[in-house]
């Protein structure tokens, strides 16, 4: 299970993206925030690959790279991303090849630290074509 937030409302969803109902305050599930207006009702669907990606990333990312409040962000055009504590935004996209994406991100983070580059965005959505700026 995970939580899916749209606007100020938060819903409990299953791994297939089906909305179960309103989330209870204090639920300890991974949170996915979608920045759009609208409402969800039980039985509606959200992108299952985004739910699965956020849950998997909460397990794959080492503690220093976990997002504050276990909150992952979702946008239809970029998929799942994480606002890191150091100010970087890291785009992971969908739930495909997440172990590779995390390993690639960690290698890029080490390279960024080594060179002292100033970074705002790291994108590992596409195997073989990661980048940062």
PLM segments and residue spans:
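Charged, solvent-exposed interaction patches on well-folded alpha/beta domains
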Residues: 1-133
């Amino acid at each position: 299970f995970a939580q899916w937030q749209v606007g100020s409302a938060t819903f409990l969803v299953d791994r297939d993206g089906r909305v179960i109902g309103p989330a209870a305050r204090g639920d300890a599930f991974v949170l996915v925030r979608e920045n759009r207006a609208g409402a969800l009702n039980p039985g509606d669907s959200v992108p299952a690959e985004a739910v699965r990606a956020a849950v998997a990333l909460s397990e794959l990312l080492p503690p220093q790279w976990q997002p504050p409040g276990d909150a992952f962000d979702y946008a239809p055009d970029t998929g799942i991303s994480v606002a890191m504590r150091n100010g970087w935004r890291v785009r992971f996209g969908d739930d495909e090849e997440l172990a590779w994406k995390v390993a690639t991100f960690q290698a890029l983070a080490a390279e960024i630290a080594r060179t002292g580059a100033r970074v705002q965005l790291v994108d590992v959505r596409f195997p073989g074509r990661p980048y940062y700026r």
